Curated annotation (Swiss-Prot):
Protein name, entry field: UPF0746 protein DDB_G0280811
Lineage of origin: Eukaryota, Amoebozoa, Evosea, Eumycetozoa, Dictyostelia
Family of the protein in this entry: Belongs to the UPF0746 family.
Annotated Basic and acidic residues bias: 1-35
Signal peptide (from-to): none
Length: 890
């Protein structure tokens, strides 16, 4: 595809070349006169070649009016804007939007009355989220501090009460506790805070124990504070350190992070100074071995200090340590452009050697002494850290710092038994320790097969009985089967069978072979294992039996081969719906089974709650299209309850839109009206169940296109492609209206209000849709104002609805809606006047209007609060009370 795009760009360039040179037949003198202009044009062509191919296609689409309109017709641009962004919480806004920082920057710079940042909690979430140390983040914090400080020159009155410089201590404390070096550094520079002030904050607000449980972030901020001389003497990283070595020294860490962690740790303390202090306090006895280890550590630190990060390639730095040691990452020198993959020895070449080699243009004369073995470097890092902890932790805590199994696997050549003794038995190993040990040993390609056989035999013979408990056998079984090594599995099964033959059946210790194979079939990751079971253990297990349910466990990548093996002996798979809807892959399996009725038998007898959770869980996993495919082809025994469609509060409510469009594609407002009329007739007898009964809809669907090849489809007897099917579902009136709202069918909602006011405006339907708890979560300022205008124009029975909408507008801070009401020439401003005996044209009493203002104060939108206080005819005492509330929050 890339080549095709490049060809197209070259063709475009060639076309331009021909256009520029179309006067080649002119006289030579004319050519010379045009030569500067030709050169200028050719220079433009060269810059054009630097454009990414995808950008060419973007502009082709962007300039095509028809395609452009079609794409942007899916965006509700007039409905959503800054006025609909309320607060910047960490989950839904900061991490839920890829451009959240840009939105905040734009909102601040726009001097808009509607500020997204509403309170200190929003700022704390920002500090917790944006920590990257780059120019963009630094500029962002400078802008933030400038905007929210007492010296701000913004012409707009801030709706928020935040003033960074009015409580310097509190914000320093928050930035340290959120380990945000970037924000703290910019904060100190912006407000020109001296080191003594920071020390004072540390002494009062940050306990020395804060650095006791050390993470990478805490090491980073500790060293930063130390570098600017802002650490009080009471705050020492050591001996309070209690680092989680399992995380800190994990071989799954990226190499570059591991190097940084090492440097942060070593830089955080002066070993010699600490040793001298401990000697003075009599805490450290000078023993020859201690001195030897201390000298060894210093020597390793010196050696590692000579190694520069620039000597490693980007591939190496971005790889995990485990991958580097397993030789699965391409490695290359830091200067040469060629990359070579190694399988025996990982090396880097010193920059000095590279420099000399490049100057001499001779890559064959590299001094072998200048080559550094990467494995040795990694080993030095680990040994240095282990020695470091030996000298810095309290004696009573030294027992928790043990070397991990992977350290012995990669850096020490020891027997399996000896490694078990070191990393498991010595520490009275937990189930997790056993799990890690067995899986690592059995999957390690560098350990001889005979040693693995011996391990299996020792476990089955209870050689590890000291720490190996009965239920730990299942951990071992899983480790064997997850190895996906046919030789190991075969050896294990034969030994199990042999042990069972020598035992009394009633007290057999281990499960049957057939049960073991089925219990762990979800671990099979290659066809050869399936073939092995099929050829050798087919009669001893249920894996390939007729109507077996093991298809639920087989990995999707292998399911086709499993179907082939099962079908080759005339058997079918069975897929029961009950209890399996929570499996992440169940919907994919279900769709596959529906399309292959000759291979699967399916029972759709699950309850409505089963189907609800199936849809719920898969919407959360971005599988809207799979759900649609399922609904298009499934044969339900009863209408499906889809009340989940009305979910407005779930974090994935927006993902439901695709499904809602699919279901309501051919359901007109007239058909909805007919259904509601039937519901309305049922309400006359005031029966609760009937009044709140669900509405049943029928939508027309087309069976999904089969994903299998035509030949395979013919073999398994797939459903007819393109066949029209009917699908019945039920929803409540509330959910119906929420769905119409989400589909931008607000006109249809108003149509239904007009046609069936008795349905929506009766007291027992007062909780439907327009209640504050429901409309609050989904309404934009644009549509909320539409509803307000509609209720104003139809005041017969809509006063309650109108009031709820005004409360929502106030709480969300939609200032413009109230400005429009106040400036309206349609005499709607009376809505914001107090109803009295002499003024019956108003709708709301003093308490109701007071509550509207209270909501704006609670949301910290003081501009709106002051607007309403000044306009509503409160008493002088009432105005003063509301203004005092504002002052208390400022």
């Amino acid at each position: 595809m890339v080549n095709n795009k490049r060809k197209e760009i070259d063709n475009i360039n060639e076309h331009h070349e021909k256009d520029y040179n179309h006067d080649n037949g002119n006289q030579q003198e004319k050519k010379k006169e045009e030569q500067p202009q030709q050169q200028q044009k050719k220079q433009c062509i060269l810059s054009f070649k630097d454009v990414e191919p995808v950008e060419i296609y973007f502009w082709k689409v962007f300039r095509n009016i028809f395609i452009f309109k079609h794409i942007f017709s899916n965006f509700k641009s007039k409905q959503y804007g800054y006025y609909d962004l309320i607060g910047c919480d960490e989950i839904f806004f900061l991490n839920g939007r890829t451009n959240s920082m840009e939105i905040i920057i734009d909102n601040i710079k726009s001097n808009n009355n509607h500020q997204i940042i509403r309170n200190e909690s929003n700022i704390i979430d920002i500090i917790h989220t944006f920590k990257k140390n780059d120019e963009k983040t630094r500029s962002f914090y400078n802008l933030l501090f400038s905007r929210y400080s007492s010296g701000s020159t913004s012409p707009i009155q801030l709706s928020s009460t935040i003033r960074f410089d009015e409580n310097i201590d509190k914000w320093i404390q928050r930035m340290i506790k959120n380990v945000n070096c970037t924000a703290l550094d910019q904060f100190i520079k912006f407000f020109k805070i001296d080191s003594e002030a920071i020390k004072k904050v540390m002494e009062i607000h940050i306990k020395p124990s804060f650095f006791g449980y050390t993470t990478y972030g805490k090491l980073k901020i500790y060293n930063y504070l130390k570098s600017i001389n802002s650490l009080p003497t009471s705050h020492k990283l050591l001996p309070f350190i209690n680092t989680d070595l399992e995380i800190f020294l994990s071989f799954d860490n990226k190499f570059k992070k591991f190097i940084k962690s090492y440097k942060r740790l070593i830089e955080s303390t002066n070993l010699q100074e600490q040793q001298e202090q401990q000697e003075k306090q009599g805490k450290l006895k000078i023993h020859p071995n201690n001195k030897k280890y201390y000298e060894k550590l210093n020597q390793k630190i010196l050696e590692l200090n000579e190694i520069q990060t620039s000597q490693f390639t980007n591939d190496q730095l971005n790889s995990t340590i485990k991958n580097l040691l397993n030789h699965t990452t391409p490695t290359s020198t830091s200067i040469t452009t060629t990359t070579t993959t190694t399988t025996t020895n990982l090396t880097i070449i010193s920059t000095e050697s590279n420099y000399n080699n490049n100057n001499n243009h001779n890559h064959n004369n590299i001094n072998s002494n200048n080559k550094i073995n990467l494995k040795d470097i990694i080993k030095k890092y680990y040994e240095s850290i282990y020695l470091f902890f030996y000298f810095t932790v309290k004696p009573e805590n030294k027992g928790v710092f043990r070397k991990g199994l992977f350290y012995y696997l990669k850096f020490k050549k020891e027997s399996v038994d000896k490694m078990y003794e070191r990393v498991v038995n010595k520490w009275n190993g937990s189930s997790f320790d056993h799990k890690l040990f067995f899986q690592s040993i059995l999957k390690d390609i560098n350990i001889e097969k005979n040693e693995k056989f011996e391990l299996i035999l020792n476990v089955l013979d209870n050689k590890y009985v000291k720490t190996f408990r009965e239920y730990d056998h299942y951990i071992f079984f899983k480790a064997v089967f997850s190895s996906n090594d046919i030789e190991l599995i075969d050896y294990f099964l034969k030994k199990i069978k042999q042990l069972q033959l020598n035992q009394i059946p009633e007290i057999t210790k281990y499960p049957s072979i057939g049960k073991l194979i089925c219990d762990y079939c979800h671990l099979i990751d290659k066809k050869e294992i399936l073939d092995f079971y099929f050829q050798n253990y087919r009669d001893e297990c249920l894996l390939f039996n007729d109507q077996n349910e093991n298809c639920k466990y087989i990995q999707l990548e292998l399911i086709e081969h499993y179907e082939y093996l099962t079908g080759s002996i005339g058997n079918r798979c069975k897929l029961d719906f009950i209890y399996w809807y929570k499996n992440l892959n169940f919907l994919d399996r279900l769709n596959r089974a529906i399309m292959k009725p000759l291979v699967y038998s399916i029972d759709f007898g699950g309850s409505s709650s089963d189907f609800k959770w199936l849809i719920d869980s898969n919407i959360n996993n971005n599988k809207e299209n799979s759900i649609i495919n399922f609904l298009s082809n499934a044969q339900f025994k009863q209408p499906l309850d889809l009340e989940i469609l009305g979910s407005s509060f779930s974090p994935y409510a927006a993902k439901l839109l695709t499904l809602i469009k699919f279901l309501f594609n051919n359901i007109s407002k007239e058909s909805i009206e007919t259904k509601l009329k039937v519901i309305n007739l049922k309400t006359d007898n005031k029966n609760f169940e009937e009044k709140y009964s669900k509405i049943e809809f029928t939508t027309t669907l087309t069976t999904a296109t089969n994903l299998l090849s035509p030949k395979k489809s013919e073999d398994v007897g797939c459903l007819t492609i393109g066949k029209t099917e009917s699908f019945n579902f039920t929803i409540s009136i509330t959910t119906l209206l929420v769905c119409l709202y989400k589909l931008d069918r607000v006109d249809d909602i108003i149509y239904l209000f007009d046609k069936l006011p008795e349905v929506f405006l009766k007291s027992y339907y007062s909780s439907i849709f327009t209640k504050e708890y429901c409309i609050y979560s989904i309404s934009s300022s644009y549509y909320l104002e539409l509803f307000i205008n509609y209720f104003i124009a139809n005041l017969n029975d809509t006063t309650n609805y109108l009031y709820h909408c005004l409360c929502i507008a106030s709480e969300k801070g939609y200032t413009q809606i109230f400005k429009n009401i106040i400036s309206s020439d349609q005499n709607s401003k009376y809505l914001l006047k107090i109803q009295t005996e002499s003024n019956q044209s108003s709708l709301f009493d003093s308490k109701l209007l007071n509550d509207i203002v209270d909501k704006s104060i609670s949301s910290l939108n003081f501009e709106l609060s002051n607007l309403l206080i000044d306009f509503i005819d409160f008493s002088a005492n009432g105005q003063n009370t509301l203004k005092m509330k504002i002052l208390k929050l400022k």
